[in-house]
């Protein structure tokens, strides 16, 4: 079964982008390359059980096994040693990427309290978009009763767009609710 968002991109969004930005080839049209989810678990230095819970939750949200990230260098102020496990990340591509984006835009973001749209300023100048989510509870896979700690996560949407304007147009047409 083909993904709804992927089909919409191929049949409606890509032709609209080609027309709007006057591309000479279909391959010039920007597309989503990957989505990276990152959960920093700073309190994993004192209690490693927190990291296990974060990894489990990230796995439920993304649908694939997270990679545990390690500290690159020691920082005495944070009681951190080089090589300590301090977070988890997942890189989504292909079908899972479109599934996650669909779920994020249509299910998770509307569940955020006092939500007025995502920021227009979170582009990095090269067509990538970064979104911070304050609580993992907005995702339908997370059971509210089993969560003992509210954690946030970063969502980075990497596109092949050359400029922020192209990337913004792509994400807006995919349904990303930008603030007016």
Swiss-Prot record:
Xref: SUPFAM superfamilies: RL5-like
Record-stated family: Belongs to the universal ribosomal protein uL5 family.
Keyword rRNA-binding: yes
Entry keyword set: Ribonucleoprotein, Ribosomal protein, RNA-binding, rRNA-binding, tRNA-binding
Single GO biological process annotation from the record: translation
PANTHER family: 60S RIBOSOMAL PROTEIN L11-RELATED (PTHR11994)
Quaternary structure and partners: Part of the 50S ribosomal subunit; part of the 5S rRNA/L5/L18/L25 subcomplex. Contacts the 5S rRNA and the P site tRNA. Forms a bridge to the 30S subunit in the 70S ribosome.
Record's function text: This is one of the proteins that bind and probably mediate the attachment of the 5S RNA into the large ribosomal subunit, where it forms part of the central protuberance. In the 70S ribosome it contacts protein S13 of the 30S subunit (bridge B1b), connecting the 2 subunits; this bridge is implicated in subunit movement. Contacts the P site tRNA; the 5S rRNA and some of its associated proteins might help stabilize positioning of ribosome-bound tRNAs.
Any one of the GO CC terms: ribosome
Any Pfam family hit: Ribosomal_L5
Transmembrane segments: none
Signal sequence annotation: none
PROSITE patterns: RIBOSOMAL_L5
The protein, known as: Large ribosomal subunit protein uL5
A GO molecular function held by the record: tRNA binding
Database matches in HAMAP family: Ribosomal_uL5_B
């Amino acid at each position: 079964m083909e993904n709804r968002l992927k089909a919409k991109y191929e049949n409606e969004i890509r032709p609209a982008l080609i027309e709007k930005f006057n591309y000479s080839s279909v391959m010039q049209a920007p597309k989503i390359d990957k989505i990276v989810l990152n959960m920093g678990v700073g309190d994993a230095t004192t209690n490693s059980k927190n990291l296990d819970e974060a990894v489990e939750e990230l796995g439920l949200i993304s649908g694939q096994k997270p990679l545990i990230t390690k500290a690159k260098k020691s920082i005495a102020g944070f009681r951190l040693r080089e090589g300590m496990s301090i977070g988890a990340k997942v890189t989504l591509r292909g079908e899972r990427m479109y599934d996650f984006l669909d779920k994020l835009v249509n299910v998770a973001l509307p569940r955020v309290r006092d939500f007025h749209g995502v920021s227009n300023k979170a582009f990095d100048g090269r067509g990538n978009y970064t979104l911070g989510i304050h609580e993992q509870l907005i995702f339908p896979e997370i059971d509210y009763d089993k969560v003992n700690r509210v954690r946030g996560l970063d969502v980075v949407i990497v596109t092949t767009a050359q400029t922020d304007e192209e990337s913004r147009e792509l994400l807006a047409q995919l349904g990303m609710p930008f603030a007016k």
